[in-house]
Amino acid sequence: MKWLLCINNKDYPASLEVMKLYKQLDDPTAEQLGMVRIIDESGEDYLYANSLFIQVPTVFGNYIDMALSV
């Protein structure tokens, strides 16, 4: 699973928290448009600009997945 770190919540303060990790859902069409699909604070999945996040390196994402599965 891919994880993203929010680095900017401008225009979305109720939906995104800066410095919070979000699960990236697979959406190839969104990626072609420079967007990412995540589950935000509402608990629903929405599209956001890719520029609001940085991708967590896979090795750290694997550790996050393992920690959450315990």
Q: What is each stretch, according to the model?
A:
Residues L47-V70:
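C-terminal structural segments of small proteins and small subunits
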